[in-house]
């Protein structure tokens, strides 16, 4: 049994080897085209077979077919120029280079006008536009700096800045090149100092600071009016305790006022005949303020009395 399996396996290897040899012998004969250097001697059948192979190649020969397609296009163009019948190839979509979409692929085939695309390569070859050593930085006609320099570092290296190449505010302050000689390096502080008068202090931006600043410079007579806190107003010498002590003292009686007896109102309410015997001075002096105490008992119910208690 093992011998049969080994013989079958060896026969399969032989069949695979024979098929590979047949493919290698037949494939080149179908691809090779007997073309000579003279393009006029190419037969139409050979041209058609060549075009078919170029237009529909196998995926593994895609790059090679693209190169052959470009070569065929160049041959057709040379033939038209030699005959004198120049015909634009753009009408035929088969000859368009739609497969070339990468700049690197176009540059590799020499289809770009400028093969150098890298700034580093152009700089190494000396192809970058540079100014001459004796050429002025500014434009001679307009008197203004050239618009080619847009970077602050380039302007500083070329001497186009007004501060001798210094670009840092801290460096300018250390070198005493700032317009304000007090060493201020903050842009907001510089702007405030430039806008303020020379004899004036720093402008106060806080309400409390403004109030203190005004009270210290010629506004002492209005010191009491500038108080904003009730406690400060109460303890101030103008509006506080001393002002109360300066007023005339009012003497209060030592004993309590002689008010009428509150129970007296209940005595005369049931009988209205004793109005003439009442002392109206005592009644007015009592000044009843509670409605339940003023109304007669007949109109004030027991429930209202309980709620008031």
UniProtKB/Swiss-Prot annotation:
Keywords for this protein: Amidation, Cleavage on pair of basic residues, Neuropeptide, Secreted, Signal
Coiled-coil boundaries: none
Chain positions found as Asparagine amide: 182
Superkingdom: Eukaryota
Keyword set includes Aminoacyl-tRNA synthetase: no
Residue span of region Disordered: 126-147
Annotated TM spans: none
Residues bearing the modification Tyrosine amide: 164
Residue ranges of the propeptide: 29-99
MF-aspect GO terms: neuropeptide hormone activity; receptor ligand activity
Signal peptide range: 1-28
Feature: compositional bias, Acidic residues: 133-144
Major place of residence: secreted
One Gene Ontology CC term in the entry: extracellular space
Cellular compartment(s): Secreted
Disulfide bonds: none
Any one GO biological process: receptor guanylyl cyclase signaling pathway
The name this protein goes by in its record: Neuropeptide-like 1
Source organism of this protein record: Drosophila melanogaster (Fruit fly)
């Amino acid at each position: 049994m093992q011998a049969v399996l080994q013989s079958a396996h060896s026969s399969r290897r032989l069949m695979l080897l024979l098929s590979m040899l047949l493919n290698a012998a037949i494939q080149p004969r179908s691809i090779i085209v007997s073309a000579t250097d003279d393009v006029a001697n190419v037969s139409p059948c050979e041209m058609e077979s060549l075009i078919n192979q170029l237009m529909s190649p196998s995926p593994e020969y895609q790059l090679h077919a693209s190169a052959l397609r470009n070569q065929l296009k160049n041959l057709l163009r040379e033939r038209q120029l030699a005959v004198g019948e120049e015909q634009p190839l753009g009408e035929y979509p088969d000859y368009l280079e739609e497969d070339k979409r990468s700049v690197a692929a176009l540059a590799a085939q020499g289809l770009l006008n400028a093969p150098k695309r890298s700034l580093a390569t152009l700089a190494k070859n000396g192809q970058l536009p540079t100014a001459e050593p004796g050429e002025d930085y500014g434009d001679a006609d307009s008197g203004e700096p050239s618009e080619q320099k847009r970077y602050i570092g380039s302007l500083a290296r070329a001497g186009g800045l007004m501060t001798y190449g210094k670009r840092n505010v801290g460096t300018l302050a250390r070198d005493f090149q700032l317009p304000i000689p007090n060493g201020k390096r903050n842009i907001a502080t510089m702007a405030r100092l430039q806008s303020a008068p020379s004899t004036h202090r720093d402008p106060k931006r806080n309400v409390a600071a403004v109030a203190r600043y005004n009270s210290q410079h010629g506004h002492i007579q209005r010191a009491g009016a500038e108080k904003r806190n009730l406690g400060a107003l109460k303890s101030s010498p103008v509006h506080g305790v001393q002002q109360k002590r300066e007023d005339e003292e009012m003497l209060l009686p030592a004993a309590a006022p002689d008010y009428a007896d509150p129970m007296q109102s209940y005595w005369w309410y049931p009988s209205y005949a004793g109005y003439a015997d009442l002392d109206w001075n005592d009644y007015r002096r009592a000044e009843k303020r509670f409605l339940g105490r003023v109304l007669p008992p007949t109109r004030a119910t027991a429930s209202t009395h309980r709620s008031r208690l």
